[in-house]
């Protein structure tokens, strides 16, 4: 708890081989539910918790209904419990994570679904809770195109960079062939760049009538090109810097970036009180900061570091 700001997620409940909740004397639903509830009561609520399979998660929460947007981020165990998969992409079953028979009983929380059913389930809940693990065992399910498809649908935020080397080397020796700026890059580089969130400012527009208005309306479109959302709220600001004097004006932006799902876009509408600005030319930049880590959020735009240059405004 002392280092809660540096910890995204705690995997497992300290049971099983390598902490993976398998091969344990404490693996019944009652056991893992007791352990998880007690652990949740002790761990800082800003830290997410995780279990090895979707079946574990449903068994603990006693529901097959996926977490919904109106339940997210309220501090409850339901809103904190995510997943880690150390058999990821290892077989059609992800090494025991999934089954070969479809769901049949809506009240049997311990049954496993098929690969497609369970990935569809993760596609919903992992818009709000993290998912990660390690990709293992070189096989068709971690061939590059298959891996990208499923990592995206499962909303994967992190992977072990040391294991499985056979899979990681395969990605390093594979080439991303889709059109766009990544064409020709290694599969490893593409996957690494898309784990978690990846923000990109794709469009800006200003609506201002000097003879009629005192304020300008700036619209900024942000795309999330990553596999997952961010699960921590960042501080977002617009910075106007006078190009002659260097003086800056900061405009707070009310934006809950956690709600920007993977593959989606949000439009930020910001009112700028132009009449209260000193006359001159201003550079406009967007800033996003992780206040917990005291670090800037870097966008995917070219030449962006701590801010994204948006354009200029003349008063």
Sequence positions of predicted segments:
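Acidic (Asp/Glu)-rich catalytic clusters
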Residues: 2-4, 39
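Catalytic cores of secreted or luminal carbohydrate-active enzymes
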Residues: 144-205
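Extracellular/luminal regions of secreted and cell-surface proteins that mediate adhesion/ECM remodeling
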Residues: 192-315
